[in-house]
A protein has these predicted regions:
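Alpha-helical transmembrane segments of bacterial inner-membrane membrane proteins
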Residues: 1-220
């Protein structure tokens, strides 16, 4: 309108700041949305960010039983119909620093998952390395580990070959070396090592505290 045009000419500096702020805000919204990842068309796709897993659960206390067996299903009074056709993949866990996007600080010692490599072969995509990289033998007796690429870059602020210092279950110094990085996965915020290495270095961390499940999400 004529009033708006007159106001722009009267206080051009203030008007320029207002228009610039609105333009910057619109740019931030659009640019942030460009990085948004769409969910996979099928969560059962082994190469998607879910690795073909439909659910990720945690336990407040260690579980020592195989949740795929009838004995464990009866012991914990689990719903058999929901677990029909599903497979439960257990993970050992050693707690550590928060390495998620909620932590703006450098994660020096992220939590560690101990996994059975055979349960993960063929799942997820890698920016570098693969699950077989966990069988490498780094110099100095370091333990090989895999981590999500985004966690490695932004939370840990290091690259492939970087090392982190821990203390094992017996109080001895322990080095863990990053030997590979997953690409765009849900496995962010933690390191993943072989179960054999986990049991060797963290004997006191008995049982399983985290579980990945395959199956149809519509049956939940």
């Amino acid at each position: 309108s004529q009033l708006n045009r007159r106001n722009l000419g009267r206080r051009a500096g203030r008007s320029l700041v207002t228009v610039g702020s609105m333009a910057a805000g619109a740019f931030l919204v659009v640019s942030t949305g460009a990085f948004r990842k769409a969910p996979p068309a099928s969560p059962t796709d082994l190469k998607s960010g879910t690795g073909g897993f439909s659910f990720w659960g945690e336990s407040a206390v260690p579980i020592y039983d195989d949740l795929n067996q009838d004995e464990a299903i009866s012991l914990f009074d689990l719903n058999r119909s929901l677990l029909l056709g599903a497979n439960v993949v257990p993970l050992r866990l050693r707690e550590g620093d928060d390495a998620s996007c909620l932590n703006l600080n450098n994660a020096l010692r992220p939590k560690i998952f101990g996994i059975k490599v055979s349960d993960f072969e063929g799942r997820f995509e890698f920016a570098e390395g693969n699950w077989s990289s966990l069988y490498q033998k780094p110099d100095g007796g370091a333990i090989p580990a895999l981590v999500d690429q985004n966690t490695l870059m932004w939370a840990m602020k290091m690259g492939i070959g970087g090392r982190l210092n821990y203390v094992d279950g017996e109080g001895n110094p322990l080095e863990i070396e990053v030997v590979g990085a997953l690409k765009g996965s849900m496995l962010q915020g933690a390191l993943f090592i072989k179960e054999e290495d986990f049991l060797d270095k963290f004997k006191q961390q008995g049982g399983y505290l985290s579980f990945l499940l395959t199956g149809d999400k519509d049956d939940a």
